[in-house]
UniProtKB/Swiss-Prot annotation:
Pathway: Purine metabolism; AMP biosynthesis via salvage pathway; AMP from adenine: step 1/1. Homodimer. It catalyses: AMP + diphosphate = 5-phospho-alpha-D-ribose 1-diphosphate + adenine. Catalyzes a salvage reaction resulting in the formation of AMP, that is energically less costly than de novo synthesis. This is Adenine phosphoribosyltransferase. Keywords: Cytoplasm, Glycosyltransferase, Purine salvage, Transferase. The lineage of its organism: Bacteria, Pseudomonadati, Pseudomonadota, Gammaproteobacteria, Alteromonadales.
Amino acid sequence: MTMTMNKDSLALIKQSIKTIADYPKPGIMFRDVTSLLEDASAYQATIALFVEKYQGMGFTKVVGTEARGFLFGAPLALELGIGFVPVRKPGKLPRKTIAQSYELEYGMDTLEIHVDAIKPEDKVLVVDDLLATGGTIEATVKLIRQLGGQVEHAAFVISLPDIGGEKRLAGLGLDVFALCEFEGE
Protein backbone atom coordinates (compact mmCIF):
# COMPACT_ATOMS: atom_id res chain seq x y z
CA MET A 1 0.00 0.00 0.00
CA THR A 2 1.37 3.44 -0.86
CA MET A 3 1.79 6.05 1.83
CA THR A 4 -0.46 8.46 -0.06
CA MET A 5 -3.51 6.22 0.21
CA ASN A 6 -6.21 7.84 2.27
CA LYS A 7 -6.54 6.07 5.64
CA ASP A 8 -10.16 7.19 5.91
CA SER A 9 -10.96 5.56 2.56
CA LEU A 10 -9.24 2.35 3.59
CA ALA A 11 -11.17 2.31 6.87
CA LEU A 12 -14.45 2.94 5.01
CA ILE A 13 -13.74 0.03 2.67
CA LYS A 14 -12.86 -2.40 5.45
CA GLN A 15 -15.84 -1.35 7.59
CA SER A 16 -18.24 -1.83 4.66
CA ILE A 17 -17.30 -5.51 4.29
CA LYS A 18 -19.63 -7.62 6.42
CA THR A 19 -18.41 -10.80 8.06
CA ILE A 20 -20.79 -13.75 8.12
CA ALA A 21 -19.90 -16.46 10.66
CA ASP A 22 -20.20 -20.13 9.69
CA TYR A 23 -20.91 -19.47 6.01
CA PRO A 24 -20.83 -21.42 3.73
CA LYS A 25 -19.93 -24.02 6.36
CA PRO A 26 -19.21 -24.11 10.10
CA GLY A 27 -15.91 -22.52 11.12
CA ILE A 28 -15.67 -20.18 8.13
CA MET A 29 -15.76 -16.41 8.57
CA PHE A 30 -17.11 -15.30 5.17
CA ARG A 31 -16.07 -11.80 4.04
CA ASP A 32 -19.05 -10.48 2.09
CA VAL A 33 -17.86 -7.99 -0.52
CA THR A 34 -21.43 -7.45 -1.76
CA SER A 35 -22.01 -5.19 1.23
CA LEU A 36 -19.17 -2.98 -0.07
CA LEU A 37 -20.91 -2.79 -3.45
CA GLU A 38 -24.10 -1.59 -1.73
CA ASP A 39 -22.22 1.43 -0.33
CA ALA A 40 -21.51 3.81 -3.22
CA SER A 41 -18.87 5.73 -1.25
CA ALA A 42 -16.98 2.55 -0.34
CA TYR A 43 -17.22 1.19 -3.90
CA GLN A 44 -15.97 4.48 -5.37
CA ALA A 45 -13.14 4.60 -2.83
CA THR A 46 -12.12 1.05 -3.77
CA ILE A 47 -11.82 1.87 -7.46
CA ALA A 48 -10.13 5.22 -6.73
CA LEU A 49 -7.45 3.58 -4.57
CA PHE A 50 -6.78 0.94 -7.22
CA VAL A 51 -6.45 3.72 -9.82
CA GLU A 52 -4.04 5.59 -7.53
CA LYS A 53 -1.95 2.44 -7.14
CA TYR A 54 -1.83 1.36 -10.80
CA GLN A 55 -2.17 4.49 -12.96
CA GLY A 56 0.90 5.19 -15.06
CA MET A 57 2.35 1.67 -14.75
CA GLY A 58 1.85 0.89 -18.43
CA PHE A 59 -0.81 -1.80 -18.20
CA THR A 60 -2.64 -2.56 -21.44
CA LYS A 61 -5.29 -4.94 -20.05
CA VAL A 62 -7.07 -5.72 -16.81
CA VAL A 63 -8.12 -9.35 -16.39
CA GLY A 64 -10.90 -10.13 -13.91
CA THR A 65 -11.89 -13.56 -12.67
CA GLU A 66 -15.48 -14.76 -12.55
CA ALA A 67 -17.52 -13.34 -11.09
CA ARG A 68 -16.64 -10.75 -8.48
CA GLY A 69 -13.37 -9.89 -10.21
CA PHE A 70 -15.56 -8.37 -12.94
CA LEU A 71 -17.08 -5.93 -10.43
CA PHE A 72 -13.71 -4.38 -9.62
CA GLY A 73 -11.69 -5.11 -12.75
CA ALA A 74 -14.07 -3.60 -15.31
CA PRO A 75 -14.46 -0.18 -13.63
CA LEU A 76 -10.71 -0.09 -12.95
CA ALA A 77 -9.98 -0.79 -16.63
CA LEU A 78 -12.32 2.04 -17.64
CA GLU A 79 -10.60 4.46 -15.26
CA LEU A 80 -7.18 3.40 -16.56
CA GLY A 81 -8.39 3.74 -20.17
CA ILE A 82 -7.54 0.14 -21.10
CA GLY A 83 -9.40 -3.02 -22.06
CA PHE A 84 -11.00 -5.50 -19.70
CA VAL A 85 -10.78 -9.27 -20.24
CA PRO A 86 -13.07 -11.68 -18.36
CA VAL A 87 -11.84 -15.11 -17.28
CA ARG A 88 -14.85 -17.37 -16.94
CA LYS A 89 -16.03 -20.83 -16.07
CA PRO A 90 -16.30 -23.32 -18.97
CA GLY A 91 -18.90 -22.71 -21.67
CA LYS A 92 -19.53 -19.04 -20.83
CA LEU A 93 -17.32 -17.42 -23.50
CA PRO A 94 -18.58 -17.55 -27.12
CA ARG A 95 -15.32 -17.46 -29.11
CA LYS A 96 -12.47 -19.97 -29.16
CA THR A 97 -10.96 -20.40 -25.69
CA ILE A 98 -8.13 -22.07 -23.84
CA ALA A 99 -8.72 -23.65 -20.44
CA GLN A 100 -6.80 -24.16 -17.21
CA SER A 101 -7.91 -26.52 -14.46
CA TYR A 102 -7.03 -25.99 -10.81
CA GLU A 103 -7.60 -27.67 -7.47
CA LEU A 104 -10.31 -26.65 -5.05
CA GLU A 105 -10.56 -27.70 -1.43
CA TYR A 106 -12.74 -30.63 -2.52
CA GLY A 107 -12.22 -31.28 -6.22
CA MET A 108 -11.26 -29.44 -9.37
CA ASP A 109 -12.52 -26.45 -11.35
CA THR A 110 -11.64 -24.90 -14.70
CA LEU A 111 -11.33 -21.37 -16.06
CA GLU A 112 -11.31 -20.20 -19.68
CA ILE A 113 -10.16 -17.15 -21.63
CA HIS A 114 -10.64 -16.18 -25.28
CA VAL A 115 -7.53 -17.11 -27.27
CA ASP A 116 -7.44 -13.68 -28.92
CA ALA A 117 -8.01 -11.62 -25.75
CA ILE A 118 -4.34 -11.29 -24.74
CA LYS A 119 -1.42 -10.51 -27.05
CA PRO A 120 2.30 -11.03 -26.32
CA GLU A 121 2.79 -7.27 -26.00
CA ASP A 122 0.06 -6.96 -23.34
CA LYS A 123 1.08 -5.97 -19.83
CA VAL A 124 -1.71 -7.38 -17.67
CA LEU A 125 -3.07 -6.52 -14.21
CA VAL A 126 -5.14 -9.32 -12.63
CA VAL A 127 -7.98 -8.24 -10.32
CA ASP A 128 -10.24 -10.21 -8.01
CA ASP A 129 -12.26 -9.48 -4.90
CA LEU A 130 -10.54 -11.82 -2.45
CA LEU A 131 -7.26 -13.69 -2.12
CA ALA A 132 -7.43 -16.87 -0.05
CA THR A 133 -5.50 -19.90 -1.38
CA GLY A 134 -4.52 -18.23 -4.66
CA GLY A 135 -5.65 -21.17 -6.81
CA THR A 136 -8.03 -19.17 -9.00
CA ILE A 137 -5.45 -16.46 -9.68
CA GLU A 138 -2.71 -19.02 -10.32
CA ALA A 139 -4.92 -20.59 -13.02
CA THR A 140 -5.69 -17.13 -14.42
CA VAL A 141 -1.99 -16.23 -14.58
CA LYS A 142 -1.21 -19.50 -16.36
CA LEU A 143 -3.86 -18.69 -19.00
CA ILE A 144 -2.47 -15.18 -19.55
CA ARG A 145 1.11 -16.45 -19.82
CA GLN A 146 0.05 -19.26 -22.17
CA LEU A 147 -1.22 -16.54 -24.52
CA GLY A 148 2.08 -14.67 -24.18
CA GLY A 149 0.87 -11.88 -21.90
CA GLN A 150 3.12 -10.31 -19.30
CA VAL A 151 1.62 -10.50 -15.82
CA GLU A 152 3.49 -9.45 -12.69
CA HIS A 153 0.77 -7.77 -10.60
CA ALA A 154 -2.41 -8.98 -8.90
CA ALA A 155 -4.81 -6.70 -6.99
CA PHE A 156 -7.46 -7.66 -4.46
CA VAL A 157 -9.96 -5.85 -2.28
CA ILE A 158 -9.41 -8.41 0.51
CA SER A 159 -6.55 -10.71 1.44
CA LEU A 160 -6.75 -13.52 3.99
CA PRO A 161 -3.01 -13.79 4.74
CA ASP A 162 -3.30 -16.77 7.09
CA ILE A 163 -4.47 -18.99 4.23
CA GLY A 164 -1.28 -18.65 2.17
CA GLY A 165 -2.37 -17.20 -1.16
CA GLU A 166 0.12 -14.31 -1.08
CA LYS A 167 3.05 -16.71 -0.73
CA ARG A 168 1.68 -18.94 -3.50
CA LEU A 169 1.35 -15.99 -5.90
CA ALA A 170 4.75 -14.59 -4.94
CA GLY A 171 6.10 -17.97 -6.06
CA LEU A 172 4.71 -17.16 -9.52
CA GLY A 173 6.61 -13.86 -9.53
CA LEU A 174 3.56 -11.72 -8.78
CA ASP A 175 3.52 -8.49 -6.82
CA VAL A 176 0.39 -8.94 -4.68
CA PHE A 177 -1.57 -5.94 -3.40
CA ALA A 178 -4.72 -5.90 -1.26
CA LEU A 179 -6.63 -2.94 0.14
CA CYS A 180 -7.53 -4.79 3.37
CA GLU A 181 -6.53 -7.86 5.26
CA PHE A 182 -8.60 -10.01 7.57
CA GLU A 183 -6.90 -12.47 9.89
CA GLY A 184 -8.19 -16.04 9.89
CA GLU A 185 -10.57 -17.65 7.45
